[in-house]
């Protein structure tokens, strides 16, 4: 790669024609310090396309929509009619925690991108998975040893 | 007659112009085309390191601070925030229910209900509104997004119509829940 460099003679002769301007005219506002700048390969390397998988594409989208649509009656029926049943509580717990996990996963993907946070991003994903497992166990314990999710919220709300 | 006029025109037009242009043109060309430029050869590693050092100083593109406040992206941000609030509450309570007996406490319904009964009513009614509003907003905005997934109401007028409907429905529903 050839890098051009202007000599002093050119600067002296073409001072009026080639005035040097700064790259930016406003103060640089940085949110985070820039990450270590690593350039992979050269400009002549072939482009690498991301792995194509339906499990991360349309199947994932369908699964998210199925969970969301299944949650609508499971949330609306106890919320507006007050009826409750242990099996309904169990189904609500499964879909609700799955929906919450998918939402938190989107937040982790957006706010801890793997390209920038090479170690923190997998750690956050595993922390989320651990919390989801603990939440499933906790809600199961609450549904079996206490009066259940729907009755519990109703009792707390009307106390 | 014609021969005499052409001879006079040629002599009067071209000889002074040539005299005027010749020294000025030469000096201008000499000044313009003479440049002293030196080039240096860089290895791939040196070029990459120089590019990396230049990229460190690139400014951020302007983003949240320059966008006009609009219902569209405000509701979208609020959807994620309310979802995190409701899901975070569920996660915190479930994990607390598991961990509390290790510290000698108990988070069962009877204990919490007894604590809530000691709070006066004039605090509980607005508190119920604040607690239930993230849930109701998230429910109705989620239904709004499911409506969009069927490619309905995706015009700008439809987006604003459903947005105002979500706001009205969530406020009314939370108000009803606060009064129970």
Swiss-Prot record, chain A:
Its main location: mitochondrion. One of its GO terms (biological process) is mitochondrial electron transport, succinate to ubiquinone. It is a multi-pass membrane protein. Pathway: Carbohydrate metabolism; tricarboxylic acid cycle. It is found in: Mitochondrion inner membrane. Residues 31-65, 110-122 are mitochondrial matrix. One of its GO terms (molecular function) is protein-membrane adaptor activity. Keywords: Electron transport, Heme, Iron, Membrane, Metal-binding, Mitochondrion, Mitochondrion inner membrane, Transit peptide, Transmembrane, Transmembrane helix, Transport, Tricarboxylic acid cycle. It comes from the Eukaryota. A ubiquinone binds at residue 111. InterPro entries: CybS, SQR/QFR_C/D. Heme binds at residue 99. Residues 1-30 form a transit peptide. GO terms for cellular component: mitochondrial inner membrane; mitochondrion; respiratory chain complex II (succinate dehydrogenase); TIM22 mitochondrial import inner membrane insertion complex. It holds the Pfam family CybS. Residues 83-89, 141-159 are mitochondrial intermembrane. Disulfide bonds: none annotated. Induction: Expression is down-regulated under conditions of iron depletion. SUPFAM superfamilies: Fumarate reductase respiratory complex transmembrane subunits. The chain crosses the membrane at residues 66-82, 90-109, 123-140. CDD domains: SQR_TypeC_CybS. Membrane-anchoring subunit of succinate dehydrogenase (SDH) that is involved in complex II of the mitochondrial electron transport chain and is responsible for transferring electrons from succinate to ubiquinone (coenzyme Q). Forms part of complex II containing four subunits: a flavoprotein (FP), an iron-sulfur protein (IP) and a cytochrome b composed of a large and a small subunit. Belongs to the CybS family. This is Succinate dehydrogenase [ubiquinone] cytochrome b small subunit, mitochondrial. It comes from Schizosaccharomyces pombe (strain 972 / ATCC 24843) (Fission yeast). The gene is sdh4.
Swiss-Prot record, chain B:
The keyword Cell membrane does not apply. One of its GO terms (biological process) is reductive tricarboxylic acid cycle. The chain crosses the membrane at residues 83-103, 123-143, 160-180. CDD domains: SQR_TypeC_SdhC. Keywords: Electron transport, Heme, Iron, Membrane, Metal-binding, Mitochondrion, Mitochondrion inner membrane, Transit peptide, Transmembrane, Transmembrane helix, Transport, Tricarboxylic acid cycle. The heme is bound between the two transmembrane subunits. Pathway: Carbohydrate metabolism; tricarboxylic acid cycle. It is a multi-pass membrane protein. Its cofactor is heme. It comes from the Eukaryota. It is found in: Mitochondrion inner membrane. Forms part of complex II containing four subunits: a 70 kDa flavoprotein (FP), a 27 kDa iron-sulfur protein (IP), a cytochrome B and a membrane-anchoring protein. Membrane-anchoring subunit of succinate dehydrogenase (SDH) that is involved in complex II of the mitochondrial electron transport chain and is responsible for transferring electrons from succinate to ubiquinone (coenzyme Q). PANTHER family: SUCCINATE DEHYDROGENASE CYTOCHROME B560 SUBUNIT (PTHR10978), SUCCINATE DEHYDROGENASE CYTOCHROME B560 SUBUNIT, MITOCHONDRIAL (PTHR10978:SF5). This is Succinate dehydrogenase cytochrome B subunit, mitochondrial. It comes from Schizosaccharomyces pombe (strain 972 / ATCC 24843) (Fission yeast). The gene is sdh3.
């Amino acid at each position: 790669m050839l890098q051009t460099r202007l000599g002093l003679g050119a600067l002296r002769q073409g001072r009026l024609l080639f005035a040097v301007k700064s790259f930016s005219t406003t103060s640089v506002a940085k949110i985070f310090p820039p990450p270590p700048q690593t350039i992979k390969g050269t400009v002549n390397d072939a482009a690498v396309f991301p792995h194509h998988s339906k499990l991360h594409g349309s199947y994932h989208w369908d699964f998210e929509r199925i969970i969301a649509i299944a949650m609508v009656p499971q949330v609306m029926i106890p919320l507006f009619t007050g009826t409750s049943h242990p099996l309904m509580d169990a189904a609500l717990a499964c879909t609700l925690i799955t929906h919450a996990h998918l939402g938190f996963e989107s937040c982790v993907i957006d706010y801890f991108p793997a390209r920038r946070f090479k170690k923190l991003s997998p750690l956050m994903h595993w922390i989320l998975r651990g919390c989801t497992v603990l939440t499933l166990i906790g809600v199961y314990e609450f549904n079996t040893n206490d009066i259940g999710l729907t009755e519990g919220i109703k009792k707390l709300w009307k106390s | 007659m014609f021969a005499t006029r052409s001879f006079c025109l040629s002599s009067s037009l071209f000889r002074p112009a040539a005299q005027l242009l010749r020294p000025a043109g030469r000096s201008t060309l000499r000044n313009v085309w003479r440049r002293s430029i030196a080039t240096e050869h860089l290895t791939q590693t040196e070029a990459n390191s120089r590019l990396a050092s230049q990229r460190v100083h690139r400014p951020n593109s302007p983003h949240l601070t320059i966008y006009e406040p609009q219902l569209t992206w405000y509701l979208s941000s609020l959807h994620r925030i309310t979802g995190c609030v409701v899901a975070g509450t569920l996660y915190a309570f479930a994990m607390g229910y598991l961990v509390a007996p290790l510290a000698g406490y108990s988070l069962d319904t009877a204990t919490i209900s007894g604590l809530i009964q000691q709070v006066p009513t004039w605090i509980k009614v607005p508190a119920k509104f604040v607690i239930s509003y993230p849930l109701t907003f998230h429910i109705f905005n989620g239904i709004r997004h499911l409506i969009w997934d069927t490619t309905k109401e995706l015009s700008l007028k439809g987006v604003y119509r459903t947005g105002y409907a979500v706001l009205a429905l969530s406020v009314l529903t939370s108000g009803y829940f606060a009064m129970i």
